[in-house]
Amino acid sequence: MQTTTRTLTQHKRIALVAHDSCKKNLLNWTQKHKEALKPHILYATGTTGHILERETGLSIQSLLSGPMGGDQQLGGLIAEKKIDMMIFFWDPMNAAPHDPDVKALMRIATVWNIPVAINQSSADFLLTSVLFEQDVEIDVPDYEGYLKERLA
């Protein structure tokens, strides 16, 4: 598939997601980085978003809870280029009923080439990157070209 570019502006649209056993870790991480996150537009799956907003005072756009379709909503926003990066504290030790949704979410994040952090260390690296506060060009699939090919 051909690619084109997309600009991630200095004010990022960031998805915050955590499995149940990791919500406290994500809350602690978010509290620690509250000032750095403030200028950005934050999204989260339902329960996580409500906890983060209540405990940090940050404005969070809460979607549905992950198992109720929130992971798929988030994937749709990624495909629509409405999410620039994702912080997803996931639990690799416990199976969840919505594991197929999580796999689909990670697949879409990979297809659309957005930066993804899957634990505290990678989230710290992402947030402290010199690119975090800048406009950044990323390669993304050329959907228009893909569609033209398919319809030819």
UniProtKB/Swiss-Prot annotation:
Keyword Ribosomal protein listed: no
Any one Gene Ontology BP term: methylglyoxal biosynthetic process
One Gene Ontology CC term in the entry: cytosol
Superkingdom in the source lineage: Bacteria
Cross-referenced Pfam families: MGS
Active-site residue numbers: D71
Gene3D superfamilies the UniProt entry points to: Methylglyoxal synthase-like domain
Biological function: Catalyzes the formation of methylglyoxal from dihydroxyacetone phosphate.
Protein family: Belongs to the methylglyoxal synthase family.
Protein name: Methylglyoxal synthase
Organism: Haemophilus influenzae (strain PittEE)
Lineage of the species this protein comes from: Bacteria, Pseudomonadati, Pseudomonadota, Gammaproteobacteria, Pasteurellales
Gene: mgsA
